[in-house]
């Protein structure tokens, strides 16, 4: 189940600026596309997500990426897209875990409270359309076409490497980045840890 993140939870930009969530949403809503640089599913949505985010660049909201990885992984995975919008990094998946996502890609909308307004995971154009239409209505802004020509067909997201569901609670096992973790066997990772 999705839930609002703690206002004190830190979000770190790709440039290393780390601030509590409340500081990032003082004046603006936040629309983030969550991606895992170790999944094919994340790469399939980059152009579509970039088009959707571009629609809101002039609106009174912040739009960007939330990459489950470090700055180098985010820059490599997103390429020039990492410079188009604000890019946050979440190397251990702490923020993503707090929101309740277990798959990527995903999209989340957080208001100025900061409260989670909407979230979904995987690429379901109808669900993404509801989220971005809600933001467009709130911003009194135009809506991007979803789906649009060239968008991928709907698909379920990939499990976030290292996130494991446990009676509704989530634990992170393994580093989530090594080949063992990416192969879905985080329990065999040499850097096993639980948060």
Regions found by a protein language model. Give the residues of each.
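Non-globular targeting/processing and membrane-anchoring segments
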Residues: 1-30, 40, 44, 51-62, ...
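Conserved beta-strand and immediately adjacent loop positions that scaffold enzyme active sites
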Residues: 8, 106, 177
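Aromatic-flanked redox-active Cys/Sec active sites in thiol-based oxidoreductases
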Residues: 33-39, 68
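Thiol-based oxidoreductase modules, predominantly thioredoxin-like and allied folds used
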Residues: 58-74, 83-92
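A generic "binding-loop/recognition-motif" signal
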Residues: 70, 91-92, 113, 174, ...
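Short, internal strand/loop/helix patches
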Residues: 79-108
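Glycine-rich phosphate/adenylate-binding loop and adjacent beta-alpha elements
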Residues: 169-195
């Amino acid at each position: 189940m999705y839930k609002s993140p703690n206002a004190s939870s830190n979000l770190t930009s790709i440039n290393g600026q780390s601030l509590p969530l409340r500081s990032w949403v003082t004046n603006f809503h936040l629309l983030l596309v969550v991606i895992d640089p170790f999944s094919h599913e994340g790469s399939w949505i980059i152009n579509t997500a970039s088009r959707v985010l571009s629609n809101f660049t002039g609106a009174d909201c912040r739009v960007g990426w939330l990459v489950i990885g470090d700055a180098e992984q985010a820059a490599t995975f997103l390429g020039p897209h990492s410079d188009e919008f604000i890019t946050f990094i979440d190397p251990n998946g702490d923020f993503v875990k707090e929101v309740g996502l277990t798959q990527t890609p995903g999209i989340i909308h957080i208001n100025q409270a900061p409260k989670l307004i909407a979230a979904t995971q995987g690429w379901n154009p109808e669900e993404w359309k509801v989220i971005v239409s809600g933001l467009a209505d709130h911003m009194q802004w135009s809506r991007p076409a979803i789906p649009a020509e060239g968008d991928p067909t709907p698909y379920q997201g990939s499990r976030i490497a290292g996130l494991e569901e446990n009676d509704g609670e989530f634990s992170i096992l393994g580093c989530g980045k090594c080949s063992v973790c990416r192969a879905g066997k985080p329990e065999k990772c040499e850097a096993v840890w639980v948060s």
